[in-house]
Amino acid sequence: MEYLNTAQELLDFIMRCKSPFHVVKEAGDLLNENGYTKLEETKEWSLVPGGKYYVTRNESSVIAFQIPESAFSSYQIIASHSDCPTFKVKGEDPFVTDGHYTRLNVEGYGGMIRSPWFDRPLSLAGRMVVRDGNGVKSVLVDAGRDLVTIPNLPIHLNRDINNGIKYSVQTDMLPILGDETAKDHFYELFLPDTAKEDILSMELYLYNRVEGSIWGASKEFLSSGRLDDLQSAFGSLKGFLAAKATGQVNVCAIFDNEEVGSLTKQGADSSFLTETLQHINAACGKDTIAYHRDLADRKSTRLNSSHLARSRMPSSA
């Protein structure tokens, strides 16, 4: 049953992809393994027929492409996104203390259902920017263990809990990190060998530590956190790597910030894709008219999570 192997591969991919930065790192590793060359937006590109390349922006979006062996006259594009509904730590003011506990000061990120986040083992992953000699560098970080939780009130303190509750992120859902001293050694959880004053900024996201599973009488179902939209990122990458460019440039784009409108410099509504295609066009010796003609003949597919049927409430399908 080959589909079970693919399903497990997807679940393993999701468990490694704990933030948009980790998604792009995983995508880059997979592309490197398949003979792709990383390019830089700030440098001149030298492309060859049959070449395979990729470029990243903000370390959270990636565009990979294959140049056909012969001349091309269009682009074939598949797109998905690297971010997921979650909670993001407020980097400028990350802690809330009340004399007993240290909580993380978080904001809701994307279109989430809030209730499943309660009473689960959660952790943090993302990126920190640190001093590096006379400059700075970014470092991927992951606590890698059960670190925080968002506890529900017990039923005897909230008798209406089964009658429908409206949760406020700011008052009901700040994750407990530890006792009142926890903030003093927070950064050591991620970069134990880096002085606190050398950590200049951070972008940290909560993630669910519960592993996904394959279930059902015939193992026909799959459940996991971050399916939106990592199942699409995984599927588009696998399909892209299996395809061969013939007569068109094959493009696989995974954008960040779809969950919050795509308007950032690395979002789908940014210049990233357009400028990448213009780079390809120029490096292949084609003029502006040829670029617009090729673009007009492009084929684009956007992958995202959707609903075919609603198993819990069939009447709403």
Tell what function each PLM region has.
Residues 303-317:
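Single conserved hydrophobic/aromatic residue that forms the stacking wall/gate
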Residues 1-302:
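N-terminal hydrophobic/helix-forming segments and targeting peptides
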